[in-house]
Amino acid sequence: MSRPTTIAVINQKGGVGKTTTVINLAASLSIMGQNNLVIDLDPQGNATTGFGKSNSEEEKNIYNLLIKKIDIRETIQKTEIKNLDLIGSHVNLSGLEVETANDNNRAFVLKEILSAEKNGLLDNYDNLFIDCPPSLSLLTIMALVASDELLVPLQTEFFALEGITQLVKTIDRIKENLNPSLKIRGILLTMFDKRNKLSSQVDKEARNYFKEKVYQTVIQRNVRLSEAPSHGLPCVIYDKNCVGSKSYFKLAEEFMKSGSIESAA
């Protein structure tokens, strides 16, 4: 059995569809038969609540895994979706940077945990998806160090390309100093509005700049994608026939066919 691929879903800017992508891509892949584990590394815990779980769960959370070093099996929760498990966030995660200030090895803690477990329990998974905070914090660095690949959601709005250019520079610094094998799996265009010329312009510019890194699938603006988290369900379960769900099922198919691509300088 091959080891799972660890994929961080990342953008230093908030509101780009990052958590929506984690939830619905992982759910789509699981519905298609793959085994997936979502790790919610964002203190806001939106991926956790998006699966109908609490980000104040006292035992089964990523904070206890990183700080208390408890057995990873004690942190994994089943979701309502077959083949899809979760290590949820916790409100205490926001204080992690202060709590680990004296640990010179703290950037590697998550990598060491996942690397050790990939020889055992985690081998049952095809993918480990990490939902990152929308900032370049210690938690984000931990995710970048622990990951094999990155998936970058890019909203088709003004200033989007400027932000992702800065992110690519950050990725290259991480590659140079902490994780030389890190690769970009793909860039996903989100919040696309075909009625808006700006969306089409950003789409064109992104494909001109990042070439084959950009997925052919685009995620259109869709109210059902926004509604689903309040029901504690991925949209692909909440309303599998809506435009947003169909886009994520299409992305899942493309994701399974695609390989990872070296980061641009």
Residue spans for each PLM region:
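P-loop NTP-binding core
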Residues: 1-265
